[in-house]
């Protein structure tokens, strides 16, 4: 018995693999998996390590980079005419795009040829050439442009037909004489890409000229206040709006711009305070520079924003009296037509307008690489080293944006997207783009139906319970 046990023990010892054999075995079949974490992705790991080096949050421009996993305007489709309605002929029957804003109190409402406008972007965030090209291109298309943080450029006024003067919390560059030259005043409370915070212009873009306009030192980061210095809430804002009306002799409309947050309540408060026009900027909106986390983790999407805003105005029985402008990631004519159908009177564009100028165009590719970017995926607006001369104050880079050619590209794009809106309106039997309505739409996802109150395609059933659908049905 004992001998047999010893024999088995020796046999077991002999069968034990050597350390070398064990090592070879592990090399062939590694015990450690190469599957990346679903939580700590390579991008998250890189982000943590960069913050560990910098000891601060990350700043960039452009707007949210997250995959569009939420309900968007893409989740709606139009119902063209069949036997129930008669479509319009594309080249024989007209479809009006005339747009009027500010009819509530202003003596001279804003009258535009198209319902698409250039939103506020500052001289500082953008180059001189870019600001003038936006003004000239908007004029060529029969629409408006907006000043932005930092005041008005005289050349911007000279080259625009309709100019909206933006009044922001910073009050940089505010000039009463410039304000009185404007065709409308926009009192900005927030921005879709970074609601609840002020603007940011990094020192690399604060040239001597920008510093002089803003009365601040050159080469130093400029952080704008998050709230206005002379009012705190809606009751105080009533006085501010009256002050702006007095300054402009009650002639021009007063817009109030909101970053999409508590849209239903904010729109009601803005309308109650006396706004002629309410602007709501969704979370897909762009920015020249802000903390990355604000662009990715604040605000609500444009689709939800337009529905809540319309519901708020209808609740106050002011829909139609107070006009609604929607903004935030608007890309093409179908986005615009859907926004109009959901209740917007006009649409602001920012990033799309810059792309029409040549933003992200594959020119000067080596300069994209120098700032760690590539064409079609550059969001380095904050650096001041824009390869195509749009978001820079560098004189040499700025020369790359030829004003007349850029203005023509923008005007061409405006004409194209306006034609797209008309195509959809005619297909729905409408001779005016402002006659588009929720009945012309169907939702392709349950989420979109819940948010908009538009029936889910194939069911004709409305799902939901929020303010966005209560007032549409």
PLM regions and their residue ranges:
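A structural-propensity feature for long, helix-poor, extended segments
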Residues: 101-103, 161-176, 180-183, 187-194, ...
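Active-site-facing alpha/beta catalytic cores
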Residues: 120, 125-247, 251-271
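Glycine-rich phosphate/ribose-binding loops and adjacent secondary-structure elements
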Residues: 228-398
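Flexible, glycine/charged-enriched surface loops at secondary-structure junctions
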Residues: 148-150, 250-257, 319, 428-438
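A structural motif
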Residues: 142-143, 182, 275, 344, ...
